[in-house]
Design a protein with these regions (language model features):
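Non-heme Fe(II)-dependent double-stranded beta-helix
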Residues: 2-44, 51-145, 151-152
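Conserved "cap/hinge" positions at secondary-structure junctions
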Residues: 52, 223, 245, 314-315
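Short, conserved beta-strand element in jelly-roll/cupin
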Residues: 153-170, 212, 220, 244-247
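Double-stranded beta-helix
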Residues: 170-228
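Short, flexible, surface-exposed loop segments at domain boundaries
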Residues: 251-277, 290-328
Length: 328
């Protein structure tokens, strides 16, 4: 049963430490060549888990590239493919660093991997220009329990994808999902400030599940599925990234460069489309500076800058969302 919009200022927040993922995620490899059955599972359970389907050479290249960045930061020894932590603290806030630029795109656009994504989406796929890279040491600060779709209004028919590039056993802090809870709407509490934390009492405790992830596995998470990263209690980095795929023929989220703006419009040079002018209003979801912070419509002209690289989601000539691009 769907929940109504949650507006409970006094509710106790759900903390990642409260999540006990006792369930086991199911492999969907046997459904990969049956589009209808695969989509039914996705809509019913809120995820698709595919084991070992990405080309192993492409996964190893992406792993080595991410670990090379981690080595620059002193988190691992250069050339160590296992990602064993050196003990140096992470500076944090590196999820969308330009140091990782291109790694996810090269992996997902590998022809063998594109064939997998086409089966997942049901048509040729391209990436939504939003990628977050994770090289998380043990005992890193935990994120929140959240639903991706709540923060991405207007993006239609896309599928979030999470990929681990090194073995990620339960003690390394892989992803946990609230299975089947995608059918109940959004749980985020609009009665509290951003990031609108989910109340502790709305997700059944028995719905949480996880698994041991291996390189080449692909986890597709429904935009409405509550999920979180679990604590890393190992001696290694969690090396993973999350992206999103959408229709290549009809993408709803496009990368664009800001050319000019007024208090109520923005003109951008959009990839594969060209120059377009969109209206902005108080309901536009504006995150052009920090992807985790919604900015005020009233201050639009004060924080916008020509040359900004954005993800643009539009409905006709109206901007539904402007977000800082992280093209991967």
């Amino acid at each position: 049963m769907s929940v109504d919009v949650i507006n409970r200022p006094e509710a106790e927040d759900l903390d990642v430490q409260d999540v006990v993922a006792a369930g086991e995620l199911e492999s969907c490899n046997h459904l990969l060549d049956d589009p209808e059955a695969l989509n039914r599972f996705y809509e019913e359970k809120g995820y698709i888990l595919l084991r070992g389907v990405f080309d192993q050479d492409s996964v190893a290249r992406a792993r080595d590239e991410m670990l090379a960045v981690a080595a620059q930061m002193g988190l691992v020894e250069p050339g160590d493919p296992t990602g064993k932590w050196t003990g140096k603290p992470s500076v944090g806030g590196m999820e969308e660093s330009d140091l990782y630029a291109g790694i996810a795109a090269r992996l997902i656009e590998d022809p063998a991997n594109q064939a997998v994504m086409e089966k997942v989406l049901g048509e040729p796929a391209c990436s939504v220009p939003i990628v977050q890279y994770r090289t998380y040491p043990p005992r890193s600060k935990l994120g929140t329990v959240h639903q991706d779709g709540f923060y991405s209004p207007g993006i239609q028919d896309y599928r979030p994808v999470w990929i681990s590039l090194t073995p990620c056993t339960r003690d390394m802090g892989g992803l946990a999902l609230a299975v089947g809870q995608n059918k109940r709407g959004y749980f985020h509490n609009v009665g509290k400030p951003n990031p609108f934390p989910i109340p502790r009492d709305v997700i059944p405790a028995e719905s949480w599940a996880t698994t041991d992830y291996m390189p080449g596995d692909v986890l597709v998470v429904h935009p409405c599925t509550p999920h979180c990263g679990l604590p890393n209690n190992s001696d290694r980095l969690r090396v993973s990234f999350d992206s999103r795929v959408q229709s290549a023929a009809n993408p709803s989220a496009i990368a664009a460069t800001v050319k000019s703006f007024t208090p109520t419009t923005v003109t951008v040079d959009a990839d594969r489309i060209g120059e377009i002018t969109l209206t902005i209003d108080k309901d536009s979801y504006l995150r052009p500076i920090n992807p985790g912070v919604r900015e005020s419509f009233d201050d639009f002209v004060n924080y916008m800058k020509a040359g900004m690289r954005l993800v643009v989601v539009r409905d006709g000539n109206r901007a539904v969302m402007l977000r800082k691009a992280a093209e991967g």
